[in-house]
């Protein structure tokens, strides 16, 4: 229902757990998804080599940023964000993407079962009205959500204020991030520093 809902996990055990099982399942889903993405892109006239996309992932899970970089490399878009706007973040693409997702409750509960803390990442991406977002955060808090990412480069001042208010309303901790995924994945985003109270993660 919420197309860009991301859950971050902190301080979880890396041993066998429902979370490790879920991650293994998701890797399998992502591996199958890449072939459907290739078919989708070709149907739009974007013909790129899958081998180049896989090479960017360096043996890891292939994601949309890898596709975006290769799309740019082959001249179909001028920048990664254009590749997302035109193909990789459209309603039509989400119909493909949604078949490979896991619901938020499963994610939160898996992180918690592994002894970790769960945070809702970059809430602005869900493009929800304030009341709808508040209801969603309340629902996630009921599943055991620990925090909400209030500080993020693309959050406006008004959005940041709203998220801080929601954190207070639902008794959630505050996290922040730059969305840095490495130079090969998101070369236009640099690792940033942010001072926050993080004793709750220990």
Question: PLM features: residue spans?
Answer:
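A short, surface-exposed helix-loop junction/capping segment
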Residues: 20, 49-50, 89-91
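Flexible, glycine/proline-enriched loop segments at strand-loop-helix junctions
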Residues: 20-29, 55-57, 94-95
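Conserved phosphoryl-transfer catalytic core
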Residues: 28-55
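Residue-level recognition of alpha-helix initiation/capping sites
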Residues: 32, 62, 102, 131, ...
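Short, glycine- and charge-enriched coil/turn segments that flank and shape catalytic ligand pockets
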Residues: 47, 55-62, 130
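Conserved acidic, metal-coordinating active-site core of Asp-based
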Residues: 57-123
